[in-house]
Amino acid sequence: YHGNTLGALAIGGNAWRREPFLPLPLTATGNNVMAPSDMAAGFQTIANQGLHHEPYFVEFVAKPDGTRIYTHEVTGTQVLDPGVANATIATLKGVIRSGTGSRNLRNFPRTAAGKTGTQDNNTNAWMVGFTPELTTAVWVGNPDKYLPMENIPEFVAAGVDKVIGGTFPAAIWKATMDAALFGRP
């Protein structure tokens, strides 16, 4: 897994034609080309009290009789102080309860934390969040151009004149999390 290359390819373009990643202070709110997998990997580190696990694609491989011939194992790396991660979690809970994500997430039935983000001119919109069980990142935008998501007929018909992180990305995040965690305590 190579975050920047995968990120460029994962959103539908050629890694060599994309703008380079710029380490700007507003990266987490959508001003750089980042893959949802990169955003989810960063947020899972916060959710895990600073313990980072590299993303992977295969959990296990089993024979037809159920015998496992491969199981992914990882110990993780502590990259943040747990106190710092916990303070961040406390702040990110507010985004869902009363902040920018609350329009669609105020009544989310689980303990959750997250961050919305919208790039200048509404060209990219994000919702990245987690529960104790799962971290999910949602990105809405055009993978090849910076096109403003304003007055788009399909969005307007759904009651949204201007797409921001707290609108469609938050609603998609909620629907995904509801389905993924259905039936789990």
Where in the sequence are the language-model features?
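Mid-domain, small-residue-enriched loop/turn segments at the edges of structured enzyme/sensor domains
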Residues: 1-40
